Amino acid sequence: MRSPHAFRNGESPTLRDHTHFHSTVTAQKLRRFNSLILLLRLASFSFSLASAVFMLTNSRGSASPHWYDFDAFRFVFVANAIVALYSVFEMGTCVWEFSRETTLWPEAFQVWFDFGHDQVFSYLLLSAGSAAAALARTMRGGDTCTANKAFCLQSDVAIGLGFAAFLFLAFSSCFSGFRVACFLITGSRFHLYS
């Protein structure tokens, strides 16, 4: 039986054969870094879920306008609901990484998946919030907000919560980008100083 450490004919170890050594200080820094990412994802989830709920419950009766009558408000609801689901999934992968000390998928796929989806969903929230803010401003100039102040106020709150979710997801995207850069430079998602 061949020894797992004996390489023949100039073979080199693959990334799977390569284990990363981390000192206690480095392990603590990695734990703090992963905790910060988990906290950002939790904040993104909270704000996007709150925005979706505020938009979903924004109806005052049959005489009042409904959120689903406006394309931009439907966009805000759907975008924030998608980001809330994505954030729950990403929080699960963070917890998996804490408990198992490995990624859910192969490392190369995981870092690119996180970064790419953080980018796409950040832009989705930004575009939904921008479209809804423009509509809310237009409505404020017309008769809609003078007759239905509560509807406009709740729409503004939902839009603001969506922008807050965007900010936290954008910060999370920066950390995911840092992981991609570390992966490209060192072959691992771990920090450059490990």
Swiss-Prot record:
**Is the Flavoprotein keyword given for this protein?**
no
Query: Which segments sit on the Cytoplasmic face?
Result: 1-35, 96-114, 179-194
Which keywords does this chain's UniProt record carry?
A: Cell membrane, Membrane, Transmembrane, Transmembrane helix
Recorded GO cellular component terms are: plasma membrane
- Membrane-protein topology: Multi-pass membrane protein
Chief place of localization? membrane
Q: Which residues form a coiled coil?
A: none
Q: Which residues lie on this side of the membrane: Extracellular?
A: 57-74, 136-157
Q: Does the keyword Transmembrane apply?
A: yes
The regions listed as transmembrane in this protein's record are: 36-56, 75-95, 115-135, 158-178
Q: What is the annotated localization of this protein?
A: Cell membrane
* InterPro entries documented for this protein: CASP/CASPL, CASP_dom
For this chain, the family text in UniProt reads:
Belongs to the Casparian strip membrane proteins (CASP) family.
> How does the record describe its quaternary structure?
Homodimer and heterodimers.
UniProt protein name: CASP-like protein 4C1
